[in-house]
């Protein structure tokens, strides 16, 4: 009996040891497998977040592709619904080892029926309970670890989102500062409005609170991202290629960067001195440093969290999971991002929306805006017409250059024929502007008709029909794109210089310059230099669309002697009479002196050479014309151009050739109604649209060539005109 008992006891001990070894082996394998899944899942989620949030610059993406191509493939892989991390359900699901242990336990109970006694139930129950408790504790630890990894993954996503939101908000704030500075300098969308010495406040004094907030937040975020990147380089080194210091901005000393970044605590006065009064260029430089440093931080973090840097299974412990690395690296960076974002958002919303949207509008002001709404619609339509015509003129000039090159080229016929599709494409590009211009003109006419009908209804007078046949309102076939005169985007503005390019010591201003005191001279010189510097600065900031070479080419094409004598269409020749336009030339401080030379040269040329000219006067000699219909066409074109000449009762109008000028016309007759002016914009059928448009722009203002401000009635211009008249009389 004792012998049998000893044999049974030995069998039970062997079975227990086998079960114990199976349990330990299964738990180790299961633990390693779970840790590996959590590690890889967190790394994939982190890489996917960094790449999807678009916080990396293009050069950093290219560098990542060079150093570790697996990052891009892992980040761009198809993400699961709940991410790459294993879910709690998958962690709680029993694996094959758990099922094997259950079957072994049941088999043992079946094989030993003699142990089915009451005393043995307590032993087997305690063993089963201990196993279940151990299994539940390990499952709880794994679930807690999974929740922690999920939380840090969300923190990383929030940090990347805040970084991108902060960058976009700084860009908007800089645009608001830039737009306010441009407007304060006297710029409008098309032409200058006031000179530099009347600009009011210094540019850095505008939105000073927003400028300070931008500087403080950029400086704090830049320093936090720089310290985090340096910490990663020092405590978590990678290979030599990834740790190459030439690829990092954070290793550049603070003193070389300037802008007060080397100081831990900086006063407002010191920041004012370091940034030249919180100027726009200094803020833009600091913004570029922040963008580069932020992208560098996320690039290094992506290299550190790459799946290739995951430790092997036996060496992987909960202390080596990547969420601990992320927590150690970032430290106070998420808090800095969120605090700076909130501070800048408050300042930006205050300056951007408080005075315009959140301030209550007085009732009288609202009534005034209600009354002028229809007039604003007319202004919007006319302004849209002007911008479409300007764009159309640019396209036509480019097309004309292409045609001149094709005409004068010595290439073969095959190469020339290849250019025909390009010409067709350019003509198709012109068509939308032509249609838009026509639609804007029709819209303006319809709006003016509404105003006239409303005005006549109020006064009780019959409506006066328009005598111009071109005033017929045509219903719009397609909606017209109107360009509203509000809240423009500074990068898309076309600016004209309010700074005179003439040197201050030139003959143009020498007389007035000598009458000034020494302090006034120095002040005027400083203002002149400052205004030139600001102009160049604004051109570089806003992106000046047309280069100087292109503007010079436009000037030669539009206003050269060849362009003046260029024929528009083959009609009967008319002997031109000098156009009295000193008001347009007054912007340049000059009066045309070559009228007599043009008169003599034109008298010797043939009729084919001077079939038509671009400049016509209202008092053309009717005796020299051969056809009455052509006279009407020319008189109509002259009247159209006279609409844009600036009449001044105080300035004497005289031409340079000494010819008799037309008698002064009453001001009321020279200023027709808005409807008649709009009607005259519709050119005669005898004019081609391109030629008529070029003539219209050329006759309208010569100040476009010099990019100067138009001023009327100045004493300086009257003096220059009188001096030129005296010189002509002496000759």
UniProtKB/Swiss-Prot annotation:
InterPro entries per record: Myosin-bd (IPR026859), Vezatin (IPR026858)
The lineage's top-level taxon is Eukaryota
GO terms for biological process? cell-cell adhesion
Q: Extract the coiled-coil ranges from the record.
A: 382-414
- GO MF, any single term: myosin binding
Q: Where is the composition biased (Basic and acidic residues)?
A: 590-601, 722-731
Keywords (alphabetical) are: Cell junction, Cell membrane, Cell projection, Coiled coil, Cytoplasmic vesicle, Membrane, Nucleus, Transmembrane, Transmembrane helix
Locate the region Disordered.
Answer: 570-671, 710-731
Q: Which GO terms describe its cellular component?
A: acrosomal vesicle; adherens junction; nucleus; stereocilia ankle link complex; stereocilium membrane
Pfam families assigned: Vezatin
Q: In what ranges is there compositional bias, type Acidic residues? A: 712-721
Indicate how the chain sits in the lipid bilayer. Answer: Multi-pass membrane protein
Ranges annotated as spanning the membrane: 91-111, 114-134
The UniProt regions of compositional bias labelled Polar residues, in chain numbering, are 577-586, 658-671
Where does the protein end up?
Cell membrane; Cell projection, Stereocilium membrane; Cell junction, Adherens junction; Nucleus
What PANTHER family does UniProt report for this protein, alphabetically? VEZATIN (PTHR15989:SF5)
SUBUNIT field: Interacts with USH2A (via the cytoplasmic region); the interaction associates VEZT with the USH2 complex at the stereocilia base. Interacts with myosin MYO7A and the cadherin-catenins complex.
| Functional summary from the UniProt entry | Plays a pivotal role in the establishment of adherens junctions and their maintenance in adult life. Required for morphogenesis of the preimplantation embryo, and for the implantation process.
What's this protein's family per the entry? Belongs to the vezatin family.
Which protein are we looking at? Vezatin
Source organism (scientific name): Pongo abelii
Tell me the gene name: VEZT
């Amino acid at each position: 009996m004792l012998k049998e008992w000893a044999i049974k006891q030995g069998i039970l001990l062997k079975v227990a040891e086998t079960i114990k070894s199976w349990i330990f082996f299964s738990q180790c394998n299961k633990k390693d497998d779970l840790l590996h899944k959590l590690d890889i899942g967190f790394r994939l989620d982190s890489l996917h977040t960094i790449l999807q949030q678009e916080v990396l610059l293009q050069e950093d993406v290219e560098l990542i592709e060079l150093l570790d191509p697996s990052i891009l493939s892992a980040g761009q892989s198809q993400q699961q619904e709940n991410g790459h991390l294993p879910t709690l359900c998958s962690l709680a699901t029993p694996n094959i080892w758990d099922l094997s242990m259950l079957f072994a336990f049941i088999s043992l109970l079946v094989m030993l029926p003699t142990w089915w006694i009451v005393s043995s139930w307590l032993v087997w129950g305690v063993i089963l309970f201990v196993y279940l408790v151990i299994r539940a504790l390990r499952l709880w630890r794994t679930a807690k670890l999974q929740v922690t990894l999920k939380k840090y993954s969300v923190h990383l996503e929030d940090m990347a989102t805040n970084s991108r939101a902060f960058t976009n908000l700084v860009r908007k704030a800089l645009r608001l500062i830039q737009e306010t500075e441009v407007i304060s300098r006297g710029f409008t969308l098309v032409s200058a409005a006031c000179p530099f010495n009347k600009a009011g406040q210094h540019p850095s004094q505008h939105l000073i609170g927003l400028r300070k907030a931008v500087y403080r937040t950029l400086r704090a975020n830049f320093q936090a991202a720089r310290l985090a990147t340096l910490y990663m380089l020092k405590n978590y080194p990678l290979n030599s290629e990834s740790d190459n210091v030439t690829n990092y901005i954070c290793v550049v000393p603070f003193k070389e960067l300037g802008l007060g970044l080397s100081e831990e605590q900086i006063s407002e006065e010191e920041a004012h001195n370091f940034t030249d009064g919180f100027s726009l260029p200094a803020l833009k430089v600091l913004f570029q440093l922040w963008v580069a440093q932020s992208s560098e931080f996320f690039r290094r973090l992506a290299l550190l969290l790459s799946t290739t840097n995951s430790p092997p299974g036996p060496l992987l412990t909960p202390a080596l999971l990547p969420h601990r690395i992320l927590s150690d690296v970032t430290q106070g960076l998420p808090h800095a991002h969120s605090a700076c974002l909130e501070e800048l958002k408050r300042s930006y919303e205050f300056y951007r929306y408080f005075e315009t949207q959140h301030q209550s509008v007085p009732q009288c002001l609202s009534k005034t805006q209600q009354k002028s709404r229809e007039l604003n619609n007319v202004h919007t339509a006319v302004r849209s017409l002007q911008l479409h015509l300007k764009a159309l003129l640019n396209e036509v000039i480019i097309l004309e250059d292409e045609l001149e090159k094709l005409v004068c080229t010595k290439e073969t016929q095959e190469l020339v024929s290849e250019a025909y599709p390009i010409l067709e494409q350019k003509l198709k590009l012109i068509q939308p502007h032509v249609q838009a211009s026509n639609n804007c003109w029709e819209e303006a006419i319809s709006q003016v008709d509404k105003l006239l009908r409303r005005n006549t209804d109020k006064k009780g007078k019959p409506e006066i029909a328009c005598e111009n046949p071109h005033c017929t309102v045509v219903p719009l076939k397609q909606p017209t794109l109107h360009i509203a005169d509000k809240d423009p985007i500074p990068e898309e503005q076309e600016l004209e210089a309010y700074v005179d390019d003439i040197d201050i010591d030139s003959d143009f201003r020498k007389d007035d310059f000598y009458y000034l005191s020494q302090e006034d001279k120095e002040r005027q010189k400083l203002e002149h230099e400052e205004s030139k510097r600001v102009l160049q600065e604004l051109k570089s900031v806003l992106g000046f669309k047309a280069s100087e070479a292109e503007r010079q080419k436009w000037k030669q094409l539009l206003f050269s002697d060849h362009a003046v004598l260029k024929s528009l269409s083959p009609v009967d020749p008319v002997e031109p009479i000098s156009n009295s336009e000193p008001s347009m030339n007054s912007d340049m401080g000059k009066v045309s002196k070559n009228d007599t030379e043009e008169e003599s040269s034109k008298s010797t040329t043939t009729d084919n050479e001077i079939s038509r000219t671009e400049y016509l006067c209202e008092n053309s000699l009717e005796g020299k014309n051969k056809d009455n219909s052509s006279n009407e066409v020319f008189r109509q074109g002259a009247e159209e151009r006279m609409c844009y000449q600036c009449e001044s009762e105080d300035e004497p109008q005289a031409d340079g050739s000494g010819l008799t000028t037309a008698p002064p016309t009453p001001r009321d007759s020279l200023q027709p109604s808005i409807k008649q002016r709009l009607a005259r914009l519709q050119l005669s059928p005898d004019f081609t649209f391109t030629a008529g448009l070029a003539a219209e722009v050329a006759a309208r203002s010569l100040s476009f060539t010099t990019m100067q401000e138009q001023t009327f009635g100045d004493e300086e211009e009257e003096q220059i005109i009188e001096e030129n008249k005296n010189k002509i009389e002496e000759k």
